[in-house]
């Protein structure tokens, strides 16, 4: 389907038919941090794992969250007065695109997913009026952690069926790494690389 990319350009994206976003708006769309975070978690829940026995890292992204967001822009905020100029000048306006961001990866590598979850809970208590914002963040982090745990489970299952001892050992190591980084910050170079793979896959999936 055609969607607006994070750069505001119309692109074609595959969809996961198992994903059923929950709307919080009469248009059938969903808007706001809480609904967006919870629906992104639903996408992660449906997203397949990817494990190759000969790779030292697992996890990829296969779809874009934008394919779940229809409409992409809240129709309560009308911009029809801009349509004429947009058409005249062939403007790719980007309205409805989620845009890109530049995260401080050191925070994630230092805290790990468990530490990020703790930080969200801490700041929720300090900012009661922003409950919906923290609901969305918690849903995303919980969804990513579950996605990582599914990789650990699948890697162990593949390892049990693997006859080659080297590949089996690699798969078991991969599973152990995933089990650990789902809750703890990475300790080794390989664990840090695996943490970054999951973060980048989730970030790319989002926008």
What are these regions (language model features)?
Residues 1-126:
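Long, non-catalytic protein-protein interaction scaffolds
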Residues 117-207:
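Structured, charged N-terminal subsegments at the starts of enzyme catalytic cores
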């Amino acid at each position: 389907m055609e969607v607006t990319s994070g750069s505001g350009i119309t692109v074609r994206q595959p969809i996961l038919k198992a994903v059923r976003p929950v709307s919080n708006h009469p248009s059938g769309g969903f808007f706001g941090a809480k609904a967006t975070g919870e629906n992104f978690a639903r996408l992660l829940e449906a997203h397949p794992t990817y494990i190759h026995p000969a790779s030292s890292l697992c996890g990829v992204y296969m779809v874009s969250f934008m394919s779940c967001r229809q409409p992409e822009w809240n129709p309560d905020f009308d911009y029809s007065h801009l349509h004429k100029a947009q058409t005249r000048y062939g403007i790719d306006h980007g309205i409805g695109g989620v845009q890109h961001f530049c995260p401080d990866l050191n925070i994630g590598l230092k805290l790990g997913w468990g530490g990020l979850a703790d930080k969200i809970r801490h700041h929720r208590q300090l900012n009661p009026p922003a409950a919906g914002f923290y609901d969305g963040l918690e849903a995303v982090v919980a969804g990513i952690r579950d996605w990582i745990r599914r990789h650990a489970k699948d890697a162990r299952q593949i390892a049990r069926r693997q006859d080659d001892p080297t590949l089996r050992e690699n798969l078991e190591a991969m599973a152990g790494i995933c089990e650990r980084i789902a809750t703890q910050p990475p300790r080794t170079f390989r664990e840090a690389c695996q943490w970054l793979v999951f973060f980048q896959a989730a970030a790319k999936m989002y926008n």
